[in-house]
Amino acid sequence: MPDAEQLPDGWEKRTSRSTGMSYYLNMYTKESQWDQPTEPAKKAGGGSAGGGDAPDEVHCLHLLVKHKGSRRPSSWREANITRTKEEAQLLLEVYRNKIVQQEATFDELARSYSDCSSAKRGGDLGKFGRGQMQAAFEDAAFKLNVNQLSGIVDSDSGLHIILRKA
């Protein structure tokens, strides 16, 4: 049985914010597990051609449209958001199409229409790693290629479109 204080190389012990339980984070791949590791952490890709080349961090912009079912249905733009989820989706579809058709830039639309305070930076969230964003948002962001625009992503905060920059 491994010693509780001594972890193999590449692992870090953390505490879950939602459950208060300890978990273990692979510092190379940012994957986590509940069971205490007994072997050194594997590095991203593992050297095999099909092993994937998952980044440690991504740099993304996003445009958030909140709806009345959002976790906090208010924003810097509106004190009380009353639109439905369906209305939010229609708005995002219009914004996404404008970007794809090159009728507007992501930066312009985020500054004008995003319900996130990052709107002031054109939706720029900067770089972030695994475990820093809501799971649905994070999963979508890490699946994107550089300069790829996501479809509509549903999170507790509302609906998003995401543009990965790095």
Curated annotation (Swiss-Prot):
Which Gene Ontology cellular component terms are annotated? cytosol; nucleus
UniProt lists the gene as dod
Q: Any idea what this protein is called? A: Putative peptidyl-prolyl cis-trans isomerase dodo
- Outline the extent of the PpiC domain: 55-166
SUPFAM superfamilies recorded for this chain?
Answer: FKBP-like, WW domain
Listed InterPro entries: PPIase_dom_sf (IPR046357), PPIase_Pin1 (IPR051370), PPIase_PpiC (IPR000297), PPIase_PpiC_CS (IPR023058), WW_dom (IPR001202), WW_dom_sf (IPR036020)
Q: Its Gene Ontology molecular function terms?
A: DNA-binding transcription factor binding; peptidyl-prolyl cis-trans isomerase activity
Record region (Disordered)? 32-53
List, alphabetically, the PROSITE patterns matched: PPIC_PPIASE_1 (PS01096), PPIC_PPIASE_2 (PS50198), WW_DOMAIN_1 (PS01159), WW_DOMAIN_2 (PS50020)
Which keywords label this protein?
A: Isomerase, Rotamase
Catalytic reaction equation(s): [protein]-peptidylproline (omega=180) = [protein]-peptidylproline (omega=0)
Compositional bias (Gly residues) spans?
44-53
* Coiled-coil intervals, chain numbering: none
Cytoplasm as a keyword of this entry, yes or no, is no
